[in-house]
């Protein structure tokens, strides 16, 4: 994949290279429409689709055999603000393939680390190196008014540990099947939307998204596992296919949808590709709407300060980046880090959570740390719903625990949900 290429108003388009077949993301300047771009009718353009997002005029353009001269002309068109090649995003968890049918809270060291329950590759952990869930639960277990988007591979919204905490679009649930009853442009979006397949059913055929949802909001029902929040409304937004892959256009439409349905926070356990102005624009639009964007730091053992990864490295006030630590309170070997760019660490090694079909499974990755941190932030929002995204990020950093290990990889250390909420009460 190529670097982002912007139009003449920003940077040169010289690096936009012709390819036998490629997909472009085009943003038009205000006041222009697709009819204003003559090259959209070029014989090399196979398809032009309006992405219909609320933060600008964006189009997905599929080309075949477009030559360098035509690409240059497209970038220099006075109607176009910028052109970039579509990026590919993926999920990359490390999966324990043995599904656990009869899970227990005692196995969730990320919520309560006894030192003996970390499992996996670590025979022993260190007691207390967790997110301090039991401490915060004495103060709050969340509120149904807090709405969190799980932007991922979808969610098994029928899972017995998740169903009661899934958002329900009542107008669609009580409406006519096949009709856009609420007039939001999305048909039958009862629990969210599937942008990978363009339909109203965000069911998860992969497992990653359901695992993330369980970390945020699995019910405290004396069965299965627990999430950080017992009271929450989760919106299932699927832009990653059942193979775990997605594209820029679906990512930005997912973020825009989350803004439209009024979420408070987005959990994003995905990454890949290079810098995308379109994706940055969508995250900025979420920030403008007062929505927190929690992002996984990445699983390539890299220093994000020196080698950016996206979407984690977008410099917007609402972006909170989460690295992963293990049961000993040390950086998970796979986790990215960054003193300036990774804001906090959370449990991410051998994390037990929900997967489709009323089952449970352990996975590892910053993908797991991200929703655990998102759940803790959701508890803070339950206490203080009027904080700005930047105020929330500042509090996450200020209340983190310096355990003597993680401070070399992040501003302070690991997330502590009790300190985060108690600090607000004080």
Regions found by a protein language model. Give the residues of each.
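C-terminal subdomain of the subtilisin-like protease fold in secreted/lumenal serine endopeptidases
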Residues: 226, 259-270, 277-282, 289-291, ...
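Active-site glycine-centered loops adjacent to acidic/histidine catalytic or metal-binding residues
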Residues: 152, 298, 365
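Gram-negative bacterial Sec-dependent N-terminal signal peptides
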Residues: 1-17
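Protease zymogen maturation seam
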Residues: 77-147, 155-165, 250, 410-417, ...
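Loop/turn elements at helix/coil->beta-strand transitions in domains of secreted/extracellular proteins
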Residues: 79-81, 144-147, 230-235, 260-266, ...
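Extracellular S/T/G-rich loop segment that most often corresponds to the catalytic His/Ser-adjacent loop
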Residues: 291, 309-382, 386, 390-394, ...
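Inhibitory N-terminal propeptides of secreted protease zymogens
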Residues: 17-107, 135, 263-265, 389
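Subtilisin-like serine protease catalytic core
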Residues: 134-247, 275, 287, 316-318, ...
């Amino acid at each position: 994949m190529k670097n982002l290429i912007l139009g003449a108003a920003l940077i040169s388009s010289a690096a936009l290279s012709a390819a036998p077949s490629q997909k472009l993301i085009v943003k038009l300047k205000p006041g222009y429409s697709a009819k204003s771009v003559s090259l959209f009718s070029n014989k090399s353009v196979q398809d032009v689709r309006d992405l219909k997002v609320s933060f600008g005029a964006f189009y997905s353009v599929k080309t075949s055999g477009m030559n360098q001269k035509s690409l240059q002309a497209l970038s220099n068109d006075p109607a176009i603000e910028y052109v970039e090649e579509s990026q590919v995003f993926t999920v990359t968890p490390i999966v324990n393939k043995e599904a656990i049918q009869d899970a227990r809270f005692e196995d969730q060291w990320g919520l309560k680390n006894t030192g003996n329950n970390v499992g996996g590759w670590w025979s022993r952990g260190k007691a207390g190196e967790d997110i301090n869930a039991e401490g915060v639960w004495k103060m709050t277990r969340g509120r149904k008014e807090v709405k969190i988007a799980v932007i991922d591979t979808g969610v098994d919204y029928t899972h017995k540990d998740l169903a009661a905490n899934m958002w329900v679009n009542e107008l669609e649930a009580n409406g006519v099947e096949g009709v856009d009853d609420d007039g939001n442009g999305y048909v039958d979006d009862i629990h969210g939307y599937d942008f990978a397949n363009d339909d109203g059913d965000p069911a998860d055929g992969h497992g990653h998204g359901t695992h993330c949802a369980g970390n945020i909001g699995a019910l405290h029902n004396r069965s299965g596992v627990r999430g950080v929040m017992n009271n929450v409304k989760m919106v299932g937004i699927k832009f990653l296919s059942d193979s775990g892959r997605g594209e820029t256009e679906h990512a930005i439409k997912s973020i825009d949808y989350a803004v439209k349905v009024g979420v408070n926070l987005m959990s994003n356990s995905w990454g890949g590709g290079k810098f995308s102005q379109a994706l940055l624009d969508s995250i900025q639009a979420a920030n403008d709407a007062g929505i927190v964007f929690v992002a996984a730091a990445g699983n390539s053992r890299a220093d994000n300060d020196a080698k950016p990864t996206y979407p984690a490295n977008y410099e917007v006030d609402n972006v909170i980046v989460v690295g992963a630590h293990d049961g000993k309170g040390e950086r998970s070997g796979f986790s990215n880090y960054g003193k300036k760019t990774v804001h906090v660490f959370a449990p991410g090694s051998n994390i037990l959570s929900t997967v489709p079909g009323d089952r449970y499974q352990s996975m590892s990755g910053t993908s797991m740390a991200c929703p655990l941190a998102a759940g803790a932030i959701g508890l803070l929002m339950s206490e203080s719903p009027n904080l700005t995204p930047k105020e929330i990020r500042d509090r996450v950093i200020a209340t983190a625990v310096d355990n003597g290990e993680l401070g070399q990889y992040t501003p302070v250390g690991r997330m502590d949900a009790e300190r985060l909420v108690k600090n607000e009460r004080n």
